[in-house]
């Protein structure tokens, strides 16, 4: 996977107004609820996560991919060796995993099942393309 823009848009040392805007364009994933919330409008949505989903604060980078099931791109947030932890649309390449059913489940335990990436609905993904910071708690 390669960055579309060439580099992450979140950077240290920016003027205060820029930092304030970047912080407004932040999303928070609460792993205890398997839920993603947008900091600016406080809307929250269920997500699929995994026990390996890393916690912390990360810059978001749009990455193109030709791997099947990702719709051509993912939003990367942490690289570990050859593995990119990313936010992406619900990955449905293994039907028996029932990911669409699981993301709609009210049970948090149903939504903890990925290898560490964060799966979101198509509508949430499109909104995420305009955000800069991810905080996983």
Predicted regions mapped to residue ranges:
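Short, isolated positions in well-ordered beta-strands
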Residues: 43-44, 59, 85
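Short, surface-exposed linear segments at secondary-structure transitions and domain or protein termini
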Residues: 50-60, 94-99
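Exported/periplasmic cell-wall-interacting domains
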Residues: 64-137
